[in-house]
Amino acid sequence: MPFRAALRKVPVELYPLGAAVATAVGFATYSMGKKLLADPNVHIDPTVRRTI
């Protein structure tokens, strides 16, 4: 089934919910990516591996 045909079957009332979920997923991805790239405590150095 093409995407447009499937999109027509979605009730209009669910569009704001879809937009809110997409925005939340976008913010969560941005936040997680920023944390993983910026925080030096999160990086794992392959030469130094401690058992916790």
Curated annotation (Swiss-Prot):
Keyword rRNA-binding: no
GO BP annotation list: cytochrome complex assembly
Recorded superkingdom: Eukaryota
Pfam family, one: B12D
Localization annotation: Mitochondrion inner membrane
Entry keyword set: Electron transport, Membrane, Mitochondrion, Mitochondrion inner membrane, Respiratory chain, Transmembrane, Transmembrane helix, Transport
Main location: mitochondrion
GO terms for cellular component: mitochondrial inner membrane
InterPro entries, alphabetized: B12D (IPR010530)
Chain segments annotated as transmembrane: 14-30
Chain's role: Accessory subunit of the mitochondrial membrane respiratory chain NADH dehydrogenase (Complex I), that is believed to be not involved in catalysis. Complex I functions in the transfer of electrons from NADH to the respiratory chain. The immediate electron acceptor for the enzyme is believed to be ubiquinone.
Family under the similarity heading: Belongs to the complex I NDUFA4 subunit family.
UniProt name for this protein: NADH dehydrogenase [ubiquinone] 1 alpha subcomplex subunit 4 homolog
The organism of origin for this protein: Schizosaccharomyces pombe (strain 972 / ATCC 24843) (Fission yeast)
Lineage start: Eukaryota, Fungi, Dikarya, Ascomycota, Taphrinomycotina
